[in-house]
Amino acid sequence: SEGRLRCAHVLGIMGDGAGYDTLADTVANTAAFDSENIDSYFPCVTWLDSYIIALGRTRDRRATPIILEKLAALSSDEGGGYSSHCRAVCEALEQLGDPAAAQPLAQLLERCGGAADVVTELKSVNGSSRGRNGVRNLIIARVLYRCGDWENRGRAALSAYASDLRGVYARHAKAVLERQPGEATRPEGWLGL
């Protein structure tokens, strides 16, 4: 029911797994990503994105295969809406920290260009340097590293971003690399994006 889903959603966002079954069923049985942005409730996400995030925040690793199905549906050329879907899947997988997600994340990172958007020379700065791809790929690399890395692909991308001229990217990558692969990249109980 709608009420049960709303309660499970709120509990999941708060890190409570009591509504896991309802969230898992909803995410698993939603065939495609939606496009309605729910800005007034949660910034720059759709309802499915928010359910995926809530499912990950339950920290119940039974959710991993369900979320990996959504990851498989992502395409690097999907366009503007892709960013929120990718961020939601990554947020959920980061909360779970399941090594089973490492290889699919490495494949997603490769499909999205890996560290191709790293800016190491001023002459390479252009309008696309300010796009979402660099942030998206940095997030994918961080989550891949959090899930234990796969063939050191997360470390390689993060190492490249550690040399990025955009200071916030470099500092972020360096902070992640201070930890070991598989080690939580955020404090216990963290609920932010």
Q: Model-found features: residue ranges?
A:
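Glycine-/small-residue-rich active-site loops that bind phosphorylated ligands and cofactors
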Residues: 165
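Structural detector for internal amphipathic alpha-helices that build alpha-solenoid repeat scaffolds
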Residues: 2-17, 25, 36-60, 77-98, ...
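Amphipathic alpha-helical scaffolding segments comprising HEAT/armadillo-like alpha-solenoid repeats
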Residues: 1, 16-37, 60-75, 98-125, ...
